[in-house]
């Protein structure tokens, strides 16, 4: 079972790299890539995203404060990350949901009310686009996203429990979650925060900096790491 999980995850990584480099994915017929990213559109959409960021953060803060949540600073996708995602998904920059995003972390028991409030309030304001739940059983990861429509650009609000945020986010965790929450999670798990983000950066690398052996090891280590938060994960059903 363990070997099959690693095999399919490595296949996913190989295909992701192939898409990013404009090559044929494993199991597909050889084709010549005709896709070209409109870099001028990338520049324009990133500029528009900077105008949307403050409104998204204000909206997220207004809901999070009602449910004991904490909001990360706004995150704008970099030029290179935007190009990479366009190539991977064969879309232009105006089709990407997360040019601007933030994350709300809250106690597990507040997730349902938080997400319901986000969705319903966004609908009332006419900015709701969609809700999405992600669950990766083999990696012990789950998370929820509310996508907002701001006209020319969309924004993404990720919603995680304190535990999943502790495992996944690349932020100063004490500043974000507070010392009491971080100490509690670290005492329970014995683990440092943010290691899943570290492993993910290795897994998704397309520059050649890491070998396939490095990526396979990162997948194994990431799975072990996230399984230490398994009790929290098993509760992670769809919340809305």
Task: Describe the residue ranges of each PLM region.
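Sec-dependent N-terminal signal peptides
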Residues: 4-14
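Sec/Tat signal peptide C-region and signal peptidase I cleavage site
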Residues: 16-19
């Amino acid at each position: 079972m363990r070997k099959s999980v690693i095999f399919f995850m490595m296949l996913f990584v190989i295909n992701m790299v192939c898409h990013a480099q404009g090559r044929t994915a494993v199991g597909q017929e050889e084709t010549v890539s005709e896709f070209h990213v409109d870099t001028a559109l990338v520049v324009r959409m990133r500029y528009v995203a900077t105008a949307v960021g403050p409104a998204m953060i204000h909206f997220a803060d207004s809901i999070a404060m009602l449910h004991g949540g904490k909001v990360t600073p706004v995150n704008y996708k970099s030029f290179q990350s935007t190009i990479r995602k366009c190539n991977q998904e064969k879309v232009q920059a105006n089709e990407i949901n997360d040019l601007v995003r933030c994350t709300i972390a809250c106690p597990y028991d507040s997730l349902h009310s938080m997400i319901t409030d986000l969705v319903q309030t966004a609908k009332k304001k006419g900015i709701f686009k969609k809700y999405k739940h992600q669950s990766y059983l083999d990696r012990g990861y789950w998370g929820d996203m509310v996508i907002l429509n701001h006209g020319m650009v969309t924004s993404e609000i990720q919603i995680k429990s304190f535990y999943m945020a502790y495992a996944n986010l690349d932020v100063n965790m004490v500043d974000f979650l507070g010392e009491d929450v971080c100490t509690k999670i670290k005492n329970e798990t014995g683990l440092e925060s943010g290691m899943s983000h570290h492993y993910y950066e290795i897994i998704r690398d397309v520059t050649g900096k890491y070998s396939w052996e490095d990526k396979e090891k990162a997948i194994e280590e990431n799975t072990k790491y996230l399984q230490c938060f398994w009790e929290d994960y098993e509760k992670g059903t769809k919340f809305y």
